[in-house]
Design a protein with these regions (language model features):
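N-terminal anchoring/stem segment of glycosyltransferases
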Residues: 1-90, 97-101, 236-238, 288-292, ...
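A structural signal for short, well-ordered beta-strand segments and their strand-loop junctions
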Residues: 5-6, 47-52, 106-109, 130-132, ...
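Short catalytic/ligand-binding loop motif for oxyanion handling, primarily in non-cytosolic enzymes
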Residues: 13-15, 57-61, 114-117, 122-123, ...
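Charged, glycine/proline-rich intrinsically disordered loops and linkers
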Residues: 16-21, 60-82, 139-183, 220-231
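Short, well-ordered alpha-helix to beta-strand connector turns
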Residues: 45, 102, 127, 194, ...
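GT-A fold catalytic core of metal-dependent nucleotide-sugar glycosyltransferases
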Residues: 82-156
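Catalytic core and acceptor-binding pocket of nucleotide-sugar-dependent glycosyltransferases
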Residues: 168-296
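C-terminal active-site "lid" helix and adjoining low-complexity regulatory extension at the edge
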Residues: 296-305
Length: 305
């Protein structure tokens, strides 16, 4: 069986202050973030590749090698209007491409830190797309927002106005609206986080993300024009890989598995999501907060089996 773990590290591709800060933190911790993934791949007998925005990927085999791959340039030129977000659309495109080369593939965002010796490919059924999904109701909003809604101090729309387009609840609403556009009932607020995605070649091929990308862009455009939700909500909708990914799971009733939190622990960096010694027990830690120094302090004293 040929197994691959891959990640993507791109130099700054957005002028947004928020994104620039995150790219800078990734660059600062680059060596350790890469080494953690190399070490994990070696432990479980998988190849590891790191893709860059120089149309190169680094193959960390017995002898580190640099290889040309123009997938990024081709994809970026086609979807250049989406700036930072084209990177997240691209990673799913690349997942599908690599699944044609390997039996099993695991994608890890650069800010995901493996913290286990256990083999992801053996732990879960690779016949299913393995990804963590969160039921992104208003219960996922920061506690102070939830309290305002429950107390009636602020309306739901007042709270929405204080969020941004990357909020999970907002993205779940976008997915629901797109499904409604296609006359598909959606009773939940489930939304995948694509920081960790795995599966075998056949499972990943069922997604057909790249094949359906133009379709999804058109559905999104129609959805925004229909304005099923309030304008303040609809204005947040944009081409997001997680929205599109879960839209396809629901629309096509695909076979997928919801990874347990132990294998995809997300840290957002809010007051409700502090890094603590509890993090030692998690197998994969996704630091959206980019608070790497805090995590290193804890993991340096951890011996995980």
């Amino acid at each position: 069986m040929k197994n691959l773990i891959f990640s993507i590290f791109f130099k700054k591709i957005s002028n947004s202050e928020k994104h620039v800060d995150r790219f800078n933190k990734l660059e600062l911790h680059y060596n350790r973030l890469v080494q953690k993934k190399i070490d994990y791949a070696n432990k479980i007998g998988a190849d590891f590749r790191l893709y860059t925005n120089n149309d190169l990927y680094i193959d960390f085999g017995d002898k580190q090698s640099f290889n040309t791959d123009t997938s990024w340039s081709s994809f970026k030129n086609k979807y250049r209007d989406y700036e930072f977000d084209v990177l997240n659309l691209f990673k799913i495109h690349l997942l599908e491409k690599l699944a044609k080369e390997y039996d099993n593939v695991l994608y890890l965002d650069m800010d995901v830190i493996p913290n286990t010796k256990r083999n992801f490919f053996e732990e879960f059924d690779m016949n299913k797309i393995c990804v963590r999904s969160i039921n992104a109701t208003t219960e996922v909003l920061p506690m102070n927002f939830q309290k305002h809604i429950k107390s009636g101090k602020k309306t739901y729309i007042d709270i929405i106005k204080q969020l941004d387009r990357y909020n999970e609840h907002v993205k779940a609403l976008c997915k629901k609206a797109m499904l409604i556009n296609q006359n598909i009932a959606c009773k939940d607020y489930e939304l995948v986080n694509t920081g960790i995605v795995g599966g075998n070649s056949n499972a990943i091929s069922q997604l057909k993300f790249t094949d359906n990308l133009e379709h999804m862009l058109n559905v999104l455009k129609e959805t925004k024009e229909e304005m099923f939700y309030d304008k303040d909500i609809t204005d947040y909708f944009f081409p997001n890989n997680e929205v599109f990914f879960h839209y396809l799971l629901d629309k096509n009733n695909l076979n997928w598995f919801n990874l347990p939190e132990k294998w995809h622990k997300i840290n957002y960096g809010s007051n409700d999501s502090k890094i603590s010694n509890e993090y030692k027990k998690y197998k994969m830690i996704h630091l959206i907060s980019k608070e790497f120094d805090e995590l290193w302090k804890i993991l340096d004293n951890n011996v995980e089996k």
